[in-house]
């Protein structure tokens, strides 16, 4: 018997689904993998029988499991199940949204529990204020943890003050500089051991005083917009 990789995957899914069905019949609460396998295997078999449409199976797939049939939190993890099933007239995608009702678990996976009080961003860190001028004809966006000293060379500002610093904004956010725009930003010291590598390779070493002089010289040589350079200082 010669089987394609896709056919082997379907057989594996069938075995997993049958195992999940037996465990459910024995009163065992299913985990994430078992729940998905049970639903998928059922849909594939019904599609192969050819007596039900895609719409029928999309609806039926939501009735196979209840929150009590799965382990706590599993229902909340399964947002949708998509199965490429073989119908008599060809392969079709059956997508089942929210196949298991979550049952209202108070501590569902991924739930965010917030404090009642406000959280101070970067508390205790001294901020440096800089005016930045975008001299380019395209917008420039800078992420929260980018070494600001090494941002786009068409942004002109006092790069010496930006050495070893990043934007004082929430992690994962960014600041956008439109063409010709002047904008004031606040920077804070980058945390950790102050070894800065990558970006535009202006530092690639410990961010100390000697490193600053060398980085400023490189920035000037490579045409980065620098105000109050100080590159020629001994």
Curated annotation (Swiss-Prot):
Pfam families: Urease_beta, Urease_gamma. One of its GO terms (molecular function) is nickel cation binding. It comes from the Bacteria. It catalyses: urea + 2 H2O + H(+) = hydrogencarbonate + 2 NH4(+). GO terms for cellular component: urease complex. Disulfide bonds: none annotated. Pathway: Nitrogen metabolism; urea degradation; CO(2) and NH(3) from urea (urease route): step 1/1. Keywords: Cytoplasm, Hydrolase. Residues 1-102 are annotated as: Urease gamma. One of its GO terms (biological process) is urea catabolic process. InterPro entries: Urease_beta-like, Urease_betasu_sf, Urease_gamma-beta_su, Urease_gamma/gamma-beta_su, Urease_gamma_sf, Urease_subunit. It is found in: Cytoplasm. The keyword tRNA-binding does not apply. Its EC number is 3.5.1.5. It is an enzyme of class 3 (hydrolase). Signal peptide: none annotated. Residues 103-234 are annotated as: Urease beta. CDD domains: Urease_beta, Urease_gamma. Heterohexamer of 3 UreA (alpha) and 3 UreB (beta) subunits. NCBIfam families: PRK13192.1, PRK13203.1, PRK13241.1, PRK13986.1, urease_beta, urease_gam. In the N-terminal section; belongs to the urease gamma subunit family. In the C-terminal section; belongs to the urease beta subunit family. This is Urease subunit alpha. The lineage of its organism: Bacteria, Pseudomonadati, Campylobacterota, Epsilonproteobacteria, Campylobacterales.
């Amino acid at each position: 018997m010669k089987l394609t990789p896709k056919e082997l995957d379907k057989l594996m899914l069938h075995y997993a689904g049958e195992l999940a069905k037996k465990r459910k019949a024995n009163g065992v609460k299913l985990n994430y993998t078992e729940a998905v396998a049970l639903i998928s295997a059922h849909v594939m078999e019904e599609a192969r029988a050819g007596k039900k449409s895609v719409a029928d199976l999309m609806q039926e797939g939501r009735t196979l499991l209840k929150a009590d049939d799965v382990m706590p939190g599993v229902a909340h993890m399964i947002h949708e199940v998509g199965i490429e099933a073989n119908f008599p007239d060809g392969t079709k995608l059956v997508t089942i949204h929210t196949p298991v009702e979550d049952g209202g678990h108070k501590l569902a996976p991924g739930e965010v529990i917030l404090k009642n009080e406000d959280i101070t961003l970067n508390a205790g860190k001294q901020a440096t204020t800089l005016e930045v001028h975008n001299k380019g004809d395209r917008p420039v966006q800078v992420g929260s943890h980018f070494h600001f000293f090494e941002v786009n060379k068409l942004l002109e500002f006092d790069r010496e003050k930006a050495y070893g610093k990043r934007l004082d904004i929430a992690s994962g956010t960014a600041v956008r500089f439109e063409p010709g725009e002047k904008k004031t930003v606040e920077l804070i010291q980058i945390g950790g051991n102050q070894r800065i590598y990558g970006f535009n390779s202006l530092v690639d070493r410990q961010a100390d005083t000697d490193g600053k002089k060398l980085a400023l010289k490189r920035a000037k040589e490579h045409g980065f917009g620098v105000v109050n350079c100080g590159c020629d200082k001994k």
